[in-house]
């Protein structure tokens, strides 16, 4: 089975989850994502407000990252805050 480059790109989440990521790096990530035609961009919750103008891309984030050892209540609170942020 062959898959086209465009079809493959639409299966990718273009991700930047570095704790030291800058707004400029998030902007570059978004520009790359648009150019590549990926499915979504994934950023840390604190960077979600920088993704407000992404009509053509989906936005993803993480909860309990990176360990996943947070309690369910903590993850739920993170998810609610992320939803509020964008």
Regions from the PLM with identified roles:
Residues 1-72, 76-78, 84:
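Conserved N-terminal beta1-alpha1 strand-loop-helix module at the mouth
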């Amino acid at each position: 089975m062959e898959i086209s480059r465009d079809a493959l790109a639409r299966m990718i989440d273009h991700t930047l989850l570095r704790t030291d990521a800058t707004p400029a790096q998030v902007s570059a990530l978004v520009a790359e994502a648009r150019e590549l035609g990926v499915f979504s961009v994934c950023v840390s919750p604190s960077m979600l407000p920088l993704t407000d103008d992404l009509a053509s891309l989906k936005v993803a984030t993480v909860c309990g990252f990176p360990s996943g050892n947070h309690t369910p209540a903590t993850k739920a609170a993170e998810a609610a805050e992320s939803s509020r942020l964008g």
